[in-house]
Amino acid sequence: MTTTDNLDAHTPMMQQYLRLKAQHPDILLFYRMGDFYELFYDDARRASQLLDISLTKRGASAGEPIPMAGVPYHAVENYLAKLVQLGESVAICEQIGDPAASKGPVERKVVRIVTPGTVSDEALLSERQDNLLAAIWQSPNGFGYATLDISSGRFRAAEPQDADSMAAELQRTNPAELLYPEEFTSMALIEQRRGLRRRPMWEFELETARQQLNLQFGTRDLSGFGVEQAPQALRAAGCLLQYAKDTQRTMLPHIRAITMERQQDGIIMDAATRRNLELTQNLAGGQENTLAAVLDASVTAMGSRMLKRWLHMPIRDRQALQRRQDAIEALLPLIDDLQPLLRQVGDLERILARLALRSARPRDLARMRVAFQQLPTLQTLLGERGSEALAPLARQAGRFDALCELLERALVETPPVLVRDGGVIASGYHAELDEWRALADGASDYLDRLEVREREKLGLDTLKVGFNAVHGYYIQVSRGQSHLVPIHYVRRQTLKNAERYIIPELKEYEDKVLTSKGKALALEKQLYDELFDLLLPHLAALQQSATALAELDVLSGLAERADRYGYVRPQLSERTGINIDEGRHPVVEQVLREPFIANPLTLSGARRMLVITGPNMGGKSTYMRQAALIVLMAHIGSFVPAQRAVIGPVDRIFTRVGAADDLASGRSTFMVEMTETANILHNATEHSLVLMDEIGRGTSTYDGLSLAWACAESLASRIKAMTLFATHYFELTTLPEKLEGVYNVHLDALEHGETIAFMHSVQDGAASKSYGLAVAALAGVPREVIKRARQKLRELETLSQHGNQSQADGAQLPLLVEAEPSAALEALTAIDPDVLTPRQALDWLYRLKGML
């Protein structure tokens, strides 16, 4: 990249470009030149690779050719969307001066910076996903973390105590862009994340952060927001807010508060649990067959985003949960009438953010008008229901009749995409605008009359009057009749088969029309800006309305799902335990073609651990996950897939289910498994729900069994957590004999010959066998391998017959115990078959059979 050190050697235009580029050295600069945004030097090379556009040259400056790439201004949003998805940031530099009045290069300045975490344009956002900007800070006392959704104004802060909690927050929020300080020491936490931005340490200063936030909120202190005593979170929030202001280059009036999120307010889930439960993303990274995909019947994008936030942060406040349940119950008979109204409301939340940023387009305001038009009917519908649960939401949604009437008067029915296209403001809204438009719109009548008059006067049947953007108005005559035009016809353009002329009368009219069009467009832009000034004083009430409408959408969607899938209202109890009758897995039951086998679950103070045995593919993991998902659904206020459910207090959900190598961190499958297990043993409490699936598989049989045994003992005796413990170690089925509160259950299966039928039903007691060979045969393992495995199994079972392997809590026993002496084997060894008569051989067979 050419620097600003030798500016005088460059052309004036390149001097201007280099000065602007020096202010934004680390991001791409889109430099407006006419109908294109151009990129030069290294920016051009990068953009050509990232966007797959041509790399060319634009003359030379300072004696060197200038690499150049460009994109048309009318298609810039598509290119910006691609760059944002790649984690790139772009400075948009516009022409702000008048080219006609400029003696040198047209005046330009950077008007906005588009970054992955601060985009608000509809075309650049995924409509049903939050798009978060985040900042992280670390101190010896823990972490500070803040997130901002600039497309809604939602500003959150937290203080995770350790690296595991911080990792869980990063996974929950999944920021599009993450700001971190220069001296950040826990890079392993964030180095794999997208959109990393290294920031100087001074941007995280505590006093600067307090000043920034008080200035933004118009307050003297931050005690009202609950963040005054959270210095780590404040540092992160201060850096984040300053970055947002720097990139947006405008006021941010829609950011009116910051909320402190505290772990004790919700059910805590670590990163592994969120991943294993597939809440909003499946294990393959997609969104199909997730809990969100099943539960999301929202008809607005803002409702869909709210539901995903609820799923990632289930709450523990029983009163708040019961209010949601009451609302769902009240909405059940209203679904068919309410959802069409909410669908018309659209994504009001993001429209309001663009209004606050003064970047809302005409169609945004038209959609806002449609949303306002639904509110009277919606209020009537909710009022007729007379539900106390719905009354607060109805109040917050409100009505905006005056604003609706303003937009009905001000905007045409279907406005164009951009204000600069004209035709946004409705006729009758402003008298002067109507006058200028009448003058411009009268052009076609005038041109028709002029064409008829000149054609008749001159007798030229090929004469016609037209207009194009380059040459303006013209009179066109065919080449064959061009010698007949009068002397006052001045040639303007020569075509292959025609000549185009201008006459003084037409030139005068052209000036008048173009002036009127320009004045009409300028006035229209002014009136459009004034609409922002009329709407923005109501921003706080409008944002409150959007939040209430989004919640109504979520609750009506959950009501629709409860009605369609046969969910029941769970009872939230103060007593420890989980009791579910005929529970079903909410996702699996929608994927299966055959009926889902429902199963019960009972956990209580006296029944804290279930040791679950049964065959692979028998349904152990499904049963465990379904328990966690039903508990989680109950804690977002949803109805649940069961005949009856009573859910006691739950503070955390842990899952140690499945594992894979973490190659990026250099950790084996077993290391990943043990790390997750350690987290559970350190952090689980008596109110935690713990799912442990096949602990100890990744090491030797002795080590694995010992670890599984010790973990089960710790969870049952020391921690007393509510635990579902699936295992293939049958030695663990003796735990109920040794520990209080531990019970055996198993997934049933029927074996017939070499085939197996999975019953998927949970029964009391331990499984009789693991059916491993039958499952292997079902999976397509070659018959000769299965045959050899059966032979080897018989050998091993014979060798270990009558062994004491169930005493796994005693001394460690060898895997293959030494075989006991066999009388039949000794007798067989002593027989010489060559000297036996047939009668003697038959006698020996009977004797040997008797010895077995």
From Swiss-Prot:
Main function: This protein is involved in the repair of mismatches in DNA. It is possible that it carries out the mismatch recognition step. This protein has a weak ATPase activity.
Residue sites binding ATP per the record: 614-621
Pfam families on file: MutS_I, MutS_II, MutS_III, MutS_IV, MutS_V
Listed InterPro entries: DNA_mismatch_repair_MutS, DNA_mismatch_repair_MutS-lik_N, DNA_mismatch_repair_MutS/MSH, DNA_mismatch_repair_MutS_C, DNA_mismatch_repair_MutS_clamp, DNA_mismatch_repair_MutS_core, DNA_mismatch_repair_MutS_N, DNA_mismatch_repair_MutS_sf
Protein name, per record: DNA mismatch repair protein MutS
Recorded GO MF terms: ATP binding; ATP-dependent DNA damage sensor activity; damaged DNA binding; mismatched DNA binding
GO BP annotations listed: mismatch repair
One cellular component (GO) term of this entry: cytosol
Lineage: Bacteria, Pseudomonadati, Pseudomonadota, Gammaproteobacteria, Enterobacterales
Keyword ATP-binding: yes
Transmembrane intervals: none
Domain of life where this protein originates: Bacteria
Similarity remark: Belongs to the DNA mismatch repair MutS family.
Keywords of this entry: ATP-binding, DNA damage, DNA repair, DNA-binding, Nucleotide-binding
